[in-house]
Amino acid sequence: FGLNDNGYPSQRSPINLDAIEQMSVKVAPASVEYSNFRGGVIEFVTKGGTNEFEGSVGYYDRGDSFYGDKIEGKKYTFDKEDTAESFTFGGPIIKDKAFFYVTYEDTLVTNPVLYGPAGSGAANEQSITQAQVDNIRNITKTKYGWDPLGVASTTESKQENTSIRIDYIVNENHRLTYNYKLTEGDRLRASGSNSSFYFESASYFKGEETDTSSILLVSDWADNLISEIYYSNKSTDTSQESPAGQNVPNFYIDDAYGMRVYLGADIYRSANALATETDFFKGKLTYYTGDHKITAGYEQTTYDIYNVFIVAQDGAWEFDTLADYEAGIASSFFANNAKSGTVEDAAAAFEYGLTSLYLMDEYAYSDRLSLTAGIRYDEYDSDDDPAKNAAFESTYGFANAGIAGTDLLNIRLGMDLIIDDVSDINVTYGTYSAKLPAVWISNAYTNDGVRVSAYSSSNAAAGCDPLTSAGSGLPACVQDAIKNAPLTDSKIDFIAPSFEWPDSKILNITYERDLPRDMDMTVTYLKSKQEEALYKVIDTGYPLNGDIPTVPTEVAPDGRPIYNMTGRRTYKAGLYNDCCGEREVISATLNKSFRDGDTVLSLSYTGQDSTELNGMTSSTSNSNYGKTGAVDFNNRRPQTSVYETEHRVLATLRSKHYFFGADKPTTFTLIYERKSGLPAYPTFDTFTGWTGDYKTKAFGYDYNLNDDSSSLLYIPTRNDPSCSL
């Protein structure tokens, strides 16, 4: 929830590399302590203080002076900063008893906006001139009474990372560790293209703060009995707003001096705020008896979420031409708002939890063979329900539910076999509970059709035409229409009654062998099968089978089903399960050491064949439903994953040298990488533009679901009777 494209809840890694003592990657761990993930687990161990005071100071710079300034003989000038300043300091608080370690990192990145008006010096100059931009700006200020601001020439991203670790040795049997991390940052995000011009007001600031603290108590009760008690709390706050403020509308001019022009608050940032808090408790016992290591544990995770997300809260007006814009004549309009008129009343505020129990036995059968068997039970539940939409339940026969009680039983089996003095093999098979983005759960609490409603020019009530009142705030009649809208006359998201928490079944085999001449090799094979969570739409014009939408009986000439989704911005999308995506990966690594291990050459290859039903690349239901190509969006078939990298070759050469003494090595690293690109597939678009007309009505798609442009292209054969060529 609230993650950026990099996968972090921040602009860059929230972890200062100087704070890391060691890192491990587990793709398919046999241990039942690990769950609630999809691709794997990355673990970090932070550095702790010692009896000696030590510290470091660092500076990093990769600004414009480190970049080329010519492309095909043409010289470009631009301003770019990319700097980081950091320090670490650690030592004893009480010698042999208590220690501390502190890190701090401050980063700043500025990038030029790649598109700008003619003569601006931008890397890609557009056809629109600065004088024309100024004219549109003056029209906006004079006609509509607000300033769209000027042209953003740079974007800026700032972030500060702070971490503190304190270790306290209570006595010889009890050890206490406290960790604290704070990440604060913000960024200005701007857009542009050869055909689209964005005023600075159409960009947005994104502010982020993540605050994490944890405490761990490890106790040795006997030589064969160890306990761990762990508690952590993580809170995040994210804000998104236009530089022009939050009380300005969104304007879009389809043709102004040959460009599409965007002004005002981005429709997805007009009301967009997020606050989450995650509490995690873990109690674990480890007991050694004979050749067995028995582990038992209990975990409780609580997610507390507050999310405000209203699309186009202050209205979104489209104008066909600049003349229409100057005259105040819009061609389309839509808005969403809380029925009460108060933003806070539209917030999704709910809590859900994960309770886990596990038991595992690691058995040293012999000096060469170790076996692992474990079982883990995960239960997801919530006492909070979305606002009940009685009209939805009456229409479809079930309630617009949130996350109800759903559970999974995970079983893990593992084997480690030392074949001989130079080779061993590891085999793991197990089931793993998947990690679902909390935003998919939150959608059901945000879009219930009870607290938020929509209004558009396509279904405007008599006497309430917003097309001639652009930019003066939401007309009173629009606010009244939203307040009194029927309960089904809105976008509604829900979690299907049949939904079960998805899991993965994974087989992992790893073979390792030492080779002559200081070489070693590792070969890994992984095969997994994933049950997927994905969205389906139920207002298709066809009946349901329980809560499952049925396949339409009417088909297009190429055989794909025709859905009768005629509503605009009022679709009903549910989170369902479907089976199955599959992944098959093989990798091989060869390492060669030189100079007593101070120089290491590593060569590796990874190949994968990965299929999925839906990439689920977004946060909203409509984007997830329609952005991954399909023939039948409600009944998807496995296809090549949008994340697949079919082939990857990596070579690294690391060499240590001791210019400043044996305890201060300097490391040089050379890296080579070659890999396949991400998959692509041809699609066709059945929508002509923003006027609402389709090139063909054959597929019945609603463009607000993003599926009008994601239909996989039908490729006719010679003399194909389905096509007229």
Positions of PLM-derived features:
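Transmembrane beta-barrel strands of outer-membrane/channel proteins
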Residues: 57-63, 102-106, 178-182, 229-233, ...
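Short, solvent-exposed micro-motifs at the edges of structured domains
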Residues: 500-503, 518-725
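Short loop/turn motifs that connect adjacent beta-strands in outer-membrane beta-barrel proteins
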Residues: 32-35, 49-54, 94-97, 173, ...
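Solvent-exposed loop/turn elements at secondary-structure boundaries
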Residues: 385-574, 579, 695-699, 704-713, ...
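A beta-strand signature from Gram-negative outer-membrane beta-barrel systems
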Residues: 4, 14-60, 84-97
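Hydrophobic, lipid-facing positions within transmembrane beta-strands of outer-membrane proteins
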Residues: 11, 38-40, 83-87, 160-164, ...
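Transmembrane beta-barrel wall of Gram-negative outer-membrane proteins
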Residues: 78-186, 205-233, 376, 411
